[in-house]
Curated annotation (Swiss-Prot):
Organism lineage: Bacteria, Pseudomonadati, Pseudomonadota, Gammaproteobacteria, Pasteurellales
Protein name stated in the entry: Ribosomal protein uS12 methylthiotransferase RimO
EC number: 2.8.4.4
Superkingdom of source: Bacteria
Gene this protein is translated from: rimO
Function: Catalyzes the methylthiolation of an aspartic acid residue of ribosomal protein uS12.
Radical SAM core domain boundaries: 133-374
Source organism: Histophilus somni (strain 2336)
Residue ranges occupied by any TRAM domain in the UniProt entry: 377-443
Cofactor(s) in the UniProt record: [4Fe-4S] cluster
Amino acid sequence: MSSSPNIGFISLGCPKNLVDSERILTELRSDGYNIISSYEGADLVIVNTCGFIDSAVQESLESIGEALENNGKVIVTGCLGAKENQIREIHPQVLEITGPHSYEAVMKHVHKYVPKPEYSPYTSLVPKQGIKLTPKHYAYLKISEGCDHRCTFCIIPSMRGDLDSRSIVHILDEAKRLVDAGVKEILVVSQDTSAYALDKKKENASKTVFWNGMPIKNDLITLCEKLGSLGAWVRLHYVYPYPHVDNLIPLMAEGKILPYLDIPLQHASPKILKMMKRPGSIERTLERIKKWREICPDLTLRSTFIVGFPGETEEDFQLLLDFLQEAQLDRVGCFKFSPVEGAVATDMEDQIPEEIKEERFHRFMQLQQKISAERLRQKIGRTLSVIIDEIDEEGIIGRTMADAPEIDGVVYVDNFSKVEVKLGQIINVTITNADEYDLWGEI
């Protein structure tokens, strides 16, 4: 039997794209290909691209160029792949280009240029949970593709299509495999998590689905309840502020899913929100936040905002700062508006000069850092559950229920030598200090 061919792989972009990469890698390994992390020795290189903002497009184009220069045989997939002409204009020598979540097309192209190897069908090449690019103790779980919203700053629907929710049975089966394989934290992702199954209402009304021998509804609340029964932390990301999101908060208060809500609000000026085609009642949002915290006092709220959107006046920006001050959000990300080819907002009048975007960005972050520092300071003296992400000679680094990997803060544990711990273990840590982003504590 000849040795298996090597496939190099580059994964760019968000966690949703990372899930696509994991799916492709699992398919490759199932077909007997070796996966390597270098260009040298690869029979072909796959680049899974991002195309959300111009800087991501540039990074993707540079990665394609690097792969071509160092290997020469390159297949491109992912969000930027939806703009084939843009890629061909700069890199005409790319072998094949597909759009996002085009798993079958990618595999077809791989087989064309690097024939499927022979291997023993009695040898399992893939773990039951599939190939994962995250540490063994946490994993991303994608519950749908695409989005039905048409936010004017975004081109995701043009690349990934309209909302297409996965079957609740398939999602729960995947989640159970992950937990059985040792995953301690499931991070639920999609373009629009709170829209899950809304596209399947008619279909779901006419049939009954079963999981573990019991009939279940195919909706977001049921999905969260069942995920919460598996024994792992369940964290929700990218939750659009629909009214039915209110129904998730009691599940968090009961401990069925983590008391953590990643809800991108984008702005606080009614005028700007209308121009963005986003929900515009900030007063209602503040009322909901107050109610959520009454129901679930330990709730962590994360959000993202855009400053420098076309037409944003100083008055609009001040409304955003006022909202931050009143809402007292726990975790906040801020982006300076970036024109994206194909986005409606790119062609709007009253584009904001870069120096004003920069100045507003710094004012925004300066205020939020003060808010974050105070909210974290309030945790000093409390004993919190912490999941361990890193262990080395200097100490332990972990995260509380309030911290998602990569985007939120961490907990540095000082006296770790007192007990034996391992990656993915959830331990109790007493918080002793805090800054604007991170915590320090002792076992």
